[in-house]
Amino acid sequence: MADHPAVPDDASGDDSGSGLPPEIEQLIARLTGGPVDPELAKAFKDMGIDRVDPAMVEMVAGQMQAMFSGPDEGPVNVTLATDTARKTVSQAGDSVVSEGARRQVAEAAHVAGLWLDEVTIFASAGTITHAWSRAEWVEGTMPAWRTLVEPVAQGVGAAIGGAMRAQIQQLGEGALPEGMLPAGADPAALLGQLEPMLERMSGSMFGLQVGQAVGALAAETVSGTEVGLPLVADRSVALLPANVEAFAEGLGIDLDQVRLYFAVREAARVRLFAEVPWIGPQLLAAVRDYAGAITIDTDRIETALQSVDPTDVEALQSALQGQLFRPEPSPGQRAALTRLETYLALVEGWVDVVADRATRGHLPQSDALGEAVRRRRATGGPAEKTFAGLVGLELRPRRLRDAANLWAALESAQGQEGRDRAWGHPDVAPTAADLDDPLGYVERAGGAGESEALDAAIDELLRGEAPGDGDGR
Protein backbone atom coordinates (compact mmCIF):
# COMPACT_ATOMS: atom_id res chain seq x y z
CA MET A 1 0.00 0.00 0.00
CA ALA A 2 2.90 2.38 0.67
CA ASP A 3 3.93 2.20 -3.03
CA HIS A 4 0.66 3.68 -4.22
CA PRO A 5 1.19 7.22 -5.47
CA ALA A 6 -2.21 8.37 -4.29
CA VAL A 7 -5.12 7.28 -2.17
CA PRO A 8 -8.30 6.78 -4.19
CA ASP A 9 -11.04 9.25 -3.33
CA ASP A 10 -13.59 6.55 -2.59
CA ALA A 11 -11.30 4.83 -0.10
CA SER A 12 -11.29 7.83 2.23
CA GLY A 13 -7.78 7.03 3.34
CA ASP A 14 -8.48 3.36 3.95
CA ASP A 15 -5.49 1.07 3.57
CA SER A 16 -7.13 -2.22 4.49
CA GLY A 17 -8.48 -3.02 1.04
CA SER A 18 -12.12 -2.94 2.14
CA GLY A 19 -12.80 0.37 0.43
CA LEU A 20 -14.85 1.58 3.40
CA PRO A 21 -14.21 4.86 5.23
CA PRO A 22 -11.90 4.02 8.15
CA GLU A 23 -14.36 5.35 10.74
CA ILE A 24 -17.09 3.03 9.46
CA GLU A 25 -14.72 0.06 9.07
CA GLN A 26 -13.42 0.43 12.63
CA LEU A 27 -16.95 0.69 13.98
CA ILE A 28 -18.16 -2.38 12.08
CA ALA A 29 -15.08 -4.35 13.15
CA ARG A 30 -15.69 -3.57 16.79
CA LEU A 31 -19.39 -4.36 16.62
CA THR A 32 -18.97 -7.63 14.72
CA GLY A 33 -16.13 -8.79 16.93
CA GLY A 34 -13.33 -9.02 14.37
CA PRO A 35 -12.02 -7.92 10.97
CA VAL A 36 -14.63 -6.83 8.48
CA ASP A 37 -15.55 -9.71 6.21
CA PRO A 38 -14.89 -8.80 2.54
CA GLU A 39 -18.40 -9.89 1.56
CA LEU A 40 -19.90 -7.69 4.27
CA ALA A 41 -17.69 -4.78 3.23
CA LYS A 42 -18.78 -5.20 -0.39
CA ALA A 43 -22.41 -5.24 0.70
CA PHE A 44 -21.94 -1.91 2.48
CA LYS A 45 -20.11 -0.48 -0.53
CA ASP A 46 -22.86 -1.62 -2.87
CA MET A 47 -25.27 0.31 -0.66
CA GLY A 48 -23.19 3.41 -1.34
CA ILE A 49 -21.75 3.94 2.12
CA ASP A 50 -18.30 4.71 0.66
CA ARG A 51 -19.78 7.61 -1.31
CA VAL A 52 -21.44 9.31 1.66
CA ASP A 53 -20.26 12.81 2.52
CA PRO A 54 -17.27 12.52 4.93
CA ALA A 55 -18.87 14.95 7.38
CA MET A 56 -21.99 12.77 7.45
CA VAL A 57 -19.84 9.67 7.96
CA GLU A 58 -18.09 11.31 10.89
CA MET A 59 -21.40 12.38 12.46
CA VAL A 60 -22.98 8.93 12.09
CA ALA A 61 -19.83 7.24 13.38
CA GLY A 62 -19.83 9.56 16.38
CA GLN A 63 -23.45 8.74 17.17
CA MET A 64 -22.79 5.03 16.83
CA GLN A 65 -19.59 5.20 18.87
CA ALA A 66 -21.49 6.93 21.67
CA MET A 67 -24.27 4.37 21.53
CA PHE A 68 -21.97 1.35 21.52
CA SER A 69 -19.08 2.59 23.64
CA GLY A 70 -18.08 0.56 26.65
CA PRO A 71 -18.50 -3.16 27.31
CA ASP A 72 -21.48 -5.17 26.15
CA GLU A 73 -24.00 -4.96 29.02
CA GLY A 74 -26.51 -7.46 27.71
CA PRO A 75 -30.18 -6.85 26.90
CA VAL A 76 -30.19 -3.37 28.49
CA ASN A 77 -27.30 -0.91 28.35
CA VAL A 78 -27.61 0.24 31.96
CA THR A 79 -24.76 2.73 31.70
CA LEU A 80 -26.53 4.46 28.83
CA ALA A 81 -29.86 4.23 30.68
CA THR A 82 -28.40 5.85 33.80
CA ASP A 83 -26.64 8.61 31.85
CA THR A 84 -29.79 9.33 29.84
CA ALA A 85 -31.95 9.44 32.97
CA ARG A 86 -29.53 11.81 34.70
CA LYS A 87 -29.46 14.09 31.66
CA THR A 88 -33.26 14.04 31.56
CA VAL A 89 -33.59 15.13 35.19
CA SER A 90 -30.83 17.70 34.75
CA GLN A 91 -32.65 19.29 31.82
CA ALA A 92 -35.89 19.36 33.82
CA GLY A 93 -34.09 20.92 36.78
CA ASP A 94 -32.50 19.22 39.77
CA SER A 95 -30.73 20.50 42.84
CA VAL A 96 -28.68 19.17 45.73
CA VAL A 97 -30.77 18.33 48.80
CA SER A 98 -29.91 20.60 51.72
CA GLU A 99 -28.98 19.35 55.18
CA GLY A 100 -32.13 20.97 56.52
CA ALA A 101 -34.27 19.00 54.09
CA ARG A 102 -32.48 15.79 55.04
CA ARG A 103 -33.22 16.39 58.72
CA GLN A 104 -36.88 17.06 57.93
CA VAL A 105 -37.16 13.77 56.04
CA ALA A 106 -35.45 11.85 58.85
CA GLU A 107 -37.81 13.37 61.43
CA ALA A 108 -40.87 12.65 59.28
CA ALA A 109 -39.80 9.03 58.80
CA HIS A 110 -39.30 8.62 62.56
CA VAL A 111 -42.77 9.96 63.33
CA ALA A 112 -44.27 7.84 60.54
CA GLY A 113 -42.76 4.74 62.12
CA LEU A 114 -44.36 5.49 65.49
CA TRP A 115 -47.77 6.02 63.91
CA LEU A 116 -47.51 2.83 61.85
CA ASP A 117 -46.62 0.75 64.91
CA GLU A 118 -50.17 1.42 66.12
CA VAL A 119 -52.00 0.27 62.98
CA THR A 120 -50.11 -2.69 61.46
CA ILE A 121 -48.55 -5.90 62.72
CA PHE A 122 -45.68 -5.49 60.25
CA ALA A 123 -42.56 -4.34 62.05
CA SER A 124 -40.33 -1.50 60.97
CA ALA A 125 -37.82 -2.54 58.32
CA GLY A 126 -35.10 -0.35 59.84
CA THR A 127 -34.13 3.23 60.55
CA ILE A 128 -32.38 4.15 57.29
CA THR A 129 -33.81 7.21 55.58
CA HIS A 130 -32.86 9.02 52.39
CA ALA A 131 -33.67 12.53 51.21
CA TRP A 132 -32.88 12.13 47.53
CA SER A 133 -32.49 14.49 44.65
CA ARG A 134 -33.99 13.28 41.39
CA ALA A 135 -30.58 12.15 40.16
CA GLU A 136 -29.99 10.24 43.41
CA TRP A 137 -33.34 8.48 42.97
CA VAL A 138 -32.20 7.44 39.48
CA GLU A 139 -28.97 6.00 40.87
CA GLY A 140 -30.70 4.35 43.82
CA THR A 141 -33.41 2.61 41.81
CA MET A 142 -31.67 1.79 38.50
CA PRO A 143 -30.52 -1.71 39.61
CA ALA A 144 -34.15 -2.62 40.31
CA TRP A 145 -35.28 -1.15 37.00
CA ARG A 146 -32.68 -3.28 35.26
CA THR A 147 -33.99 -6.43 36.94
CA LEU A 148 -37.54 -5.50 36.00
CA VAL A 149 -36.90 -4.47 32.40
CA GLU A 150 -34.31 -7.05 31.33
CA PRO A 151 -36.89 -9.83 30.74
CA VAL A 152 -38.82 -7.50 28.46
CA ALA A 153 -35.65 -6.47 26.62
CA GLN A 154 -34.70 -10.12 26.17
CA GLY A 155 -38.15 -10.87 24.82
CA VAL A 156 -37.99 -7.97 22.40
CA GLY A 157 -34.48 -8.89 21.25
CA ALA A 158 -35.40 -12.53 20.70
CA ALA A 159 -38.56 -11.55 18.84
CA ILE A 160 -36.71 -9.10 16.59
CA GLY A 161 -34.02 -11.66 15.79
CA GLY A 162 -36.60 -14.33 15.10
CA ALA A 163 -38.62 -12.02 12.87
CA MET A 164 -35.53 -11.04 10.86
CA ARG A 165 -34.39 -14.65 10.44
CA ALA A 166 -37.87 -15.70 9.36
CA GLN A 167 -38.01 -12.96 6.76
CA ILE A 168 -34.54 -13.75 5.41
CA GLN A 169 -35.44 -17.43 5.10
CA GLN A 170 -38.25 -16.39 2.81
CA LEU A 171 -35.93 -14.21 0.71
CA GLY A 172 -33.47 -15.23 -1.92
CA GLU A 173 -30.93 -12.98 -3.52
CA GLY A 174 -33.37 -12.19 -6.30
CA ALA A 175 -36.05 -11.07 -3.85
CA LEU A 176 -33.89 -8.20 -2.54
CA PRO A 177 -33.62 -4.84 -4.30
CA GLU A 178 -31.03 -4.88 -7.07
CA GLY A 179 -27.58 -3.97 -5.81
CA MET A 180 -28.47 -4.51 -2.16
CA LEU A 181 -26.10 -7.47 -1.92
CA PRO A 182 -23.15 -8.53 -4.06
CA ALA A 183 -23.75 -11.35 -6.51
CA GLY A 184 -23.78 -14.74 -4.83
CA ALA A 185 -23.95 -13.31 -1.30
CA ASP A 186 -25.84 -15.33 1.31
CA PRO A 187 -28.29 -13.07 3.22
CA ALA A 188 -28.39 -15.48 6.16
CA ALA A 189 -24.58 -15.48 6.46
CA LEU A 190 -24.50 -11.69 6.42
CA LEU A 191 -27.17 -11.57 9.11
CA GLY A 192 -25.07 -13.92 11.22
CA GLN A 193 -22.16 -11.49 11.01
CA LEU A 194 -24.41 -8.57 11.87
CA GLU A 195 -26.13 -10.24 14.84
CA PRO A 196 -23.60 -9.01 17.46
CA MET A 197 -24.10 -5.48 16.19
CA LEU A 198 -27.89 -5.87 16.20
CA GLU A 199 -27.80 -7.21 19.78
CA ARG A 200 -25.75 -4.25 20.97
CA MET A 201 -27.99 -1.88 19.05
CA SER A 202 -31.05 -3.42 20.71
CA GLY A 203 -29.45 -3.12 24.16
CA SER A 204 -28.47 0.48 23.53
CA MET A 205 -31.85 1.50 22.17
CA PHE A 206 -33.59 -0.16 25.09
CA GLY A 207 -31.17 1.53 27.47
CA LEU A 208 -32.00 4.86 25.87
CA GLN A 209 -35.72 4.26 26.29
CA VAL A 210 -35.35 3.07 29.88
CA GLY A 211 -33.27 6.14 30.69
CA GLN A 212 -35.86 8.50 29.26
CA ALA A 213 -38.68 6.74 31.10
CA VAL A 214 -36.89 6.60 34.46
CA GLY A 215 -35.78 10.22 34.06
CA ALA A 216 -39.37 11.30 33.44
CA LEU A 217 -40.53 9.28 36.44
CA ALA A 218 -37.84 10.88 38.64
CA ALA A 219 -39.36 14.28 37.92
CA GLU A 220 -42.71 13.17 39.39
CA THR A 221 -42.30 10.45 42.01
CA VAL A 222 -42.33 11.67 45.60
CA SER A 223 -40.70 8.63 47.21
CA GLY A 224 -38.55 5.60 46.58
CA THR A 225 -41.30 3.06 45.88
CA GLU A 226 -44.32 5.20 45.00
CA VAL A 227 -44.89 3.25 41.78
CA GLY A 228 -45.76 0.21 43.90
CA LEU A 229 -42.60 -1.74 43.11
CA PRO A 230 -39.75 -2.62 45.53
CA LEU A 231 -37.21 -0.36 43.86
CA VAL A 232 -35.01 0.50 46.86
CA ALA A 233 -32.60 -2.27 47.81
CA ASP A 234 -31.73 -1.30 51.39
CA ARG A 235 -35.35 -1.18 52.63
CA SER A 236 -34.95 2.47 53.51
CA VAL A 237 -37.59 5.19 53.60
CA ALA A 238 -36.71 7.57 50.78
CA LEU A 239 -38.43 10.85 49.92
CA LEU A 240 -37.67 13.37 47.17
CA PRO A 241 -38.12 16.78 48.88
CA ALA A 242 -38.32 18.74 45.62
CA ASN A 243 -41.14 16.54 44.30
CA VAL A 244 -42.97 16.59 47.63
CA GLU A 245 -42.90 20.39 47.53
CA ALA A 246 -44.12 20.38 43.92
CA PHE A 247 -47.01 18.10 44.89
CA ALA A 248 -47.95 20.38 47.80
CA GLU A 249 -48.19 23.47 45.60
CA GLY A 250 -51.79 24.53 45.12
CA LEU A 251 -53.22 22.12 47.69
CA GLY A 252 -53.52 24.71 50.43
CA ILE A 253 -52.09 22.20 52.91
CA ASP A 254 -49.10 22.80 55.15
CA LEU A 255 -45.92 21.29 53.66
CA ASP A 256 -45.07 19.56 56.95
CA GLN A 257 -48.35 17.62 56.76
CA VAL A 258 -47.71 16.65 53.15
CA ARG A 259 -44.21 15.43 54.00
CA LEU A 260 -45.49 13.40 56.96
CA TYR A 261 -48.27 11.87 54.89
CA PHE A 262 -45.88 10.68 52.19
CA ALA A 263 -43.42 9.45 54.82
CA VAL A 264 -46.20 7.29 56.28
CA ARG A 265 -47.13 5.91 52.85
CA GLU A 266 -43.51 5.15 51.97
CA ALA A 267 -42.72 3.59 55.36
CA ALA A 268 -45.86 1.42 55.11
CA ARG A 269 -44.86 0.22 51.65
CA VAL A 270 -41.31 -0.55 52.79
CA ARG A 271 -42.66 -2.58 55.74
CA LEU A 272 -44.91 -4.53 53.41
CA PHE A 273 -42.11 -5.40 51.00
CA ALA A 274 -39.86 -6.42 53.92
CA GLU A 275 -42.47 -8.56 55.72
CA VAL A 276 -43.97 -10.12 52.57
CA PRO A 277 -40.87 -11.45 50.79
CA TRP A 278 -42.83 -13.19 48.05
CA ILE A 279 -44.42 -10.07 46.60
CA GLY A 280 -41.29 -8.79 44.82
CA PRO A 281 -40.51 -12.12 43.07
CA GLN A 282 -44.19 -12.48 42.11
CA LEU A 283 -44.16 -9.06 40.45
CA LEU A 284 -41.00 -9.95 38.55
CA ALA A 285 -42.39 -13.36 37.57
CA ALA A 286 -45.45 -11.68 36.07
CA VAL A 287 -43.20 -9.39 34.03
CA ARG A 288 -41.14 -12.36 32.83
CA ASP A 289 -44.24 -14.31 31.86
CA TYR A 290 -45.43 -11.31 29.89
CA ALA A 291 -42.05 -10.81 28.21
CA GLY A 292 -41.71 -14.46 27.24
CA ALA A 293 -44.68 -14.16 24.89
CA ILE A 294 -43.70 -10.88 23.22
CA THR A 295 -44.13 -10.86 19.45
CA ILE A 296 -42.96 -8.20 17.04
CA ASP A 297 -45.34 -6.46 14.65
CA THR A 298 -42.93 -6.02 11.76
CA ASP A 299 -45.56 -4.31 9.60
CA ARG A 300 -46.05 -1.57 12.19
CA ILE A 301 -42.29 -1.10 12.55
CA GLU A 302 -41.86 -0.83 8.78
CA THR A 303 -44.63 1.77 8.59
CA ALA A 304 -43.14 3.75 11.47
CA LEU A 305 -39.68 3.83 9.89
CA GLN A 306 -40.70 4.82 6.37
CA SER A 307 -40.40 8.54 7.05
CA VAL A 308 -37.40 8.40 9.42
CA ASP A 309 -33.83 9.39 8.56
CA PRO A 310 -31.86 6.22 9.42
CA THR A 311 -28.85 8.34 10.48
CA ASP A 312 -30.90 10.11 13.16
CA VAL A 313 -30.64 7.82 16.20
CA GLU A 314 -33.11 9.83 18.30
CA ALA A 315 -35.70 9.89 15.51
CA LEU A 316 -35.26 6.15 15.06
CA GLN A 317 -35.80 5.54 18.78
CA SER A 318 -38.85 7.81 18.82
CA ALA A 319 -40.39 6.03 15.84
CA LEU A 320 -39.92 2.62 17.44
CA GLN A 321 -41.33 3.61 20.83
CA GLY A 322 -44.74 2.03 21.17
CA GLN A 323 -44.35 0.16 17.88
CA LEU A 324 -42.60 -2.97 19.15
CA PHE A 325 -45.66 -4.66 20.59
CA ARG A 326 -48.71 -6.09 18.89
CA PRO A 327 -51.91 -4.18 19.70
CA GLU A 328 -53.54 -7.21 21.31
CA PRO A 329 -51.62 -9.25 23.91
CA SER A 330 -51.78 -13.03 23.78
CA PRO A 331 -53.92 -14.93 26.31
CA GLY A 332 -50.78 -15.75 28.30
CA GLN A 333 -49.76 -12.11 28.33
CA ARG A 334 -53.23 -11.02 29.42
CA ALA A 335 -53.04 -13.47 32.34
CA ALA A 336 -49.61 -12.10 33.31
CA LEU A 337 -50.86 -8.52 33.08
CA THR A 338 -53.86 -9.39 35.23
CA ARG A 339 -51.60 -10.87 37.91
CA LEU A 340 -49.26 -7.89 37.78
CA GLU A 341 -52.05 -5.33 37.98
CA THR A 342 -53.76 -7.27 40.78
CA TYR A 343 -50.62 -7.37 42.93
CA LEU A 344 -49.92 -3.69 42.28
CA ALA A 345 -53.51 -2.82 43.21
CA LEU A 346 -53.31 -4.91 46.38
CA VAL A 347 -50.09 -3.19 47.42
CA GLU A 348 -51.39 0.33 46.88
CA GLY A 349 -54.84 -0.47 48.26
CA TRP A 350 -53.27 -1.79 51.47
CA VAL A 351 -51.04 1.30 51.70
CA ASP A 352 -54.11 3.54 51.27
CA VAL A 353 -55.95 1.86 54.13
CA VAL A 354 -52.97 1.69 56.49
CA ALA A 355 -51.91 5.28 55.78
CA ASP A 356 -55.45 6.46 56.47
CA ARG A 357 -55.53 4.63 59.80
CA ALA A 358 -52.08 5.92 60.78
CA THR A 359 -52.70 9.59 59.96
CA ARG A 360 -56.40 10.07 60.68
CA GLY A 361 -55.93 11.08 64.31
CA HIS A 362 -52.73 13.04 63.73
CA LEU A 363 -52.99 15.05 60.50
CA PRO A 364 -55.96 17.43 60.18
CA GLN A 365 -55.81 17.21 56.37
CA SER A 366 -55.38 13.45 56.14
CA ASP A 367 -58.59 12.91 54.14
CA ALA A 368 -57.75 15.72 51.72
CA LEU A 369 -54.27 14.32 51.17
CA GLY A 370 -55.64 10.85 50.51
CA GLU A 371 -58.04 12.26 47.94
CA ALA A 372 -55.22 14.24 46.29
CA VAL A 373 -53.17 11.05 45.93
CA ARG A 374 -56.13 9.23 44.39
CA ARG A 375 -56.71 12.06 41.90
CA ARG A 376 -53.04 12.03 40.94
CA ARG A 377 -53.16 8.31 40.17
CA ALA A 378 -56.51 8.45 38.40
CA THR A 379 -55.43 11.11 35.93
CA GLY A 380 -52.01 9.59 35.35
CA GLY A 381 -49.08 11.54 34.03
CA PRO A 382 -46.35 11.53 31.39
CA ALA A 383 -44.25 9.15 33.47
CA GLU A 384 -46.96 6.45 33.57
CA LYS A 385 -47.63 6.90 29.85
CA THR A 386 -43.94 6.77 29.02
CA PHE A 387 -43.35 3.51 30.84
CA ALA A 388 -46.52 1.95 29.46
CA GLY A 389 -45.30 2.74 25.95
CA LEU A 390 -41.81 1.52 26.77
CA VAL A 391 -42.60 -2.01 27.95
CA GLY A 392 -46.30 -2.39 27.17
CA LEU A 393 -47.16 -2.62 30.88
CA GLU A 394 -49.52 -0.45 32.90
CA LEU A 395 -47.78 0.32 36.18
CA ARG A 396 -50.69 2.25 37.66
CA PRO A 397 -53.10 -0.26 39.27
CA ARG A 398 -56.47 -0.05 37.59
CA ARG A 399 -58.34 -1.63 40.45
CA LEU A 400 -56.96 0.33 43.33
CA ARG A 401 -60.32 1.33 44.77
CA ASP A 402 -61.54 -2.28 44.74
CA ALA A 403 -58.39 -3.37 46.57
CA ALA A 404 -58.73 -0.63 49.19
CA ASN A 405 -62.36 -1.66 49.77
CA LEU A 406 -61.30 -5.29 50.20
CA TRP A 407 -58.63 -4.47 52.79
CA ALA A 408 -60.99 -2.16 54.66
CA ALA A 409 -63.71 -4.83 54.73
CA LEU A 410 -61.25 -7.47 55.92
CA GLU A 411 -60.00 -5.15 58.64
CA SER A 412 -63.56 -4.42 59.75
CA ALA A 413 -64.28 -8.15 60.05
CA GLN A 414 -60.99 -9.44 61.48
CA GLY A 415 -59.04 -6.43 62.69
CA GLN A 416 -55.64 -5.25 61.54
CA GLU A 417 -54.08 -8.62 62.33
CA GLY A 418 -56.48 -10.48 60.05
CA ARG A 419 -55.98 -7.83 57.36
CA ASP A 420 -52.21 -8.15 57.41
CA ARG A 421 -52.09 -11.94 57.75
CA ALA A 422 -53.85 -12.23 54.39
CA TRP A 423 -50.40 -11.51 52.91
CA GLY A 424 -49.05 -14.70 54.49
CA HIS A 425 -48.70 -16.66 51.23
CA PRO A 426 -49.50 -16.01 47.55
CA ASP A 427 -51.91 -18.95 47.58
CA VAL A 428 -54.12 -17.27 50.20
CA ALA A 429 -53.69 -13.64 49.12
CA PRO A 430 -56.64 -11.99 47.36
CA THR A 431 -56.95 -12.58 43.62
CA ALA A 432 -58.42 -10.61 40.74
CA ALA A 433 -61.70 -12.48 41.27
CA ASP A 434 -61.67 -11.47 44.93
CA LEU A 435 -61.41 -7.81 43.92
CA ASP A 436 -64.68 -8.31 42.05
CA ASP A 437 -66.32 -9.62 45.24
CA PRO A 438 -64.56 -8.17 48.33
CA LEU A 439 -67.32 -9.19 50.74
CA GLY A 440 -67.27 -12.74 49.43
CA TYR A 441 -63.53 -12.89 50.02
CA VAL A 442 -63.98 -11.63 53.57
CA GLU A 443 -66.60 -14.30 54.25
CA ARG A 444 -64.38 -17.02 52.82
CA ALA A 445 -61.39 -15.75 54.79
CA GLY A 446 -63.47 -15.79 57.98
CA GLY A 447 -64.70 -19.29 57.22
CA ALA A 448 -61.13 -20.44 56.70
CA GLY A 449 -60.21 -19.09 60.12
CA GLU A 450 -63.11 -20.89 61.79
CA SER A 451 -62.22 -24.11 59.98
CA GLU A 452 -58.60 -23.89 61.14
CA ALA A 453 -59.75 -23.37 64.74
CA LEU A 454 -62.09 -26.37 64.51
CA ASP A 455 -59.34 -28.54 63.03
CA ALA A 456 -57.02 -27.55 65.87
CA ALA A 457 -59.66 -28.39 68.50
CA ILE A 458 -60.34 -31.81 66.93
CA ASP A 459 -56.61 -32.50 66.79
CA GLU A 460 -56.29 -31.69 70.49
CA LEU A 461 -59.18 -34.03 71.35
CA LEU A 462 -57.62 -36.86 69.35
CA ARG A 463 -54.41 -36.41 71.33
CA GLY A 464 -56.39 -36.58 74.59
CA GLU A 465 -55.96 -32.91 75.39
CA ALA A 466 -58.56 -30.47 76.61
CA PRO A 467 -59.41 -27.97 73.86
CA GLY A 468 -57.17 -24.96 74.18
CA ASP A 469 -54.72 -26.72 76.52
CA GLY A 470 -51.81 -27.32 74.21
CA ASP A 471 -49.58 -28.96 76.84
CA GLY A 472 -52.17 -31.65 77.76
CA ARG A 473 -52.43 -30.65 81.42
Label for each model-derived stretch:
Residues E328-R473:
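Pan-zinc metallopeptidase signature
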Residues M1-G157, G415-R473:
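N-terminal low-structure segments adjacent to metalloprotease catalytic domains
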Residues L116, S204-T225, F273-F325, A335-L363:
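Post-HExxH zinc-binding segment in Zn-dependent metallohydrolases
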Residues V105-A242:
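Auxiliary, metal-adjacent structural segments of Zn-dependent hydrolase domains
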Residues L229-E245, V313-S330:
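A short mid-domain helix/strand-loop element embedded in enzyme catalytic domains
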Residues L80, A85, A92, E99, ...:
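An N-terminal structural lobe/cap that precedes and organizes the functional/catalytic core
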Residues S202, N243-V264:
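Short pre-active-site segment immediately N-terminal to the catalytic Zn-binding motif
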Residues Q257-P277, W407:
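Active-site recognition of the HExxH zinc-binding catalytic motif
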